[in-house]
Amino acid sequence: MRQSVVGIVRKDNKFLLGLRTPGGDVGEHWEFPGGKCEAGETHQQALIREYEEELAVCISVGQFIAHKHFQNEHRDFDLFAYEVIILKDQACVSSVHSELKWFSLDEL
């Protein structure tokens, strides 16, 4: 079964989300950055790699937050969420996200 990870970044009671570029199943939707785990990769290694690829930042992976199993006609996977701390203060958009934005808990 496929495993995916997301990192939840919290700063000043706001959460960092990325707007997916158009196309695919999740195009033009806001999401916590992350992605699929590669073979032999731990959740922490996958998050570090995904944040480097998607946002060009170095991170520290904190505590485990939640796990959710998803199953539908297109997907069957487990999603694991972790607290993430960005070690540098600057994140940038990539080909995966067209925009990054901070949201309050009420906006989520």
Predicted segments with their positions:
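Conserved N-terminal beta-strand and adjoining loop/helix that marks the start
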Residues: 1-16, 36
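Conserved Nudix-box catalytic region and its N-terminal flanking loop in Nudix hydrolases
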Residues: 14-53
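Active-site-adjacent beta-strand/loop module that shapes the phosphate/pyrophosphate-binding cleft
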Residues: 3, 58, 68-91, 101, ...
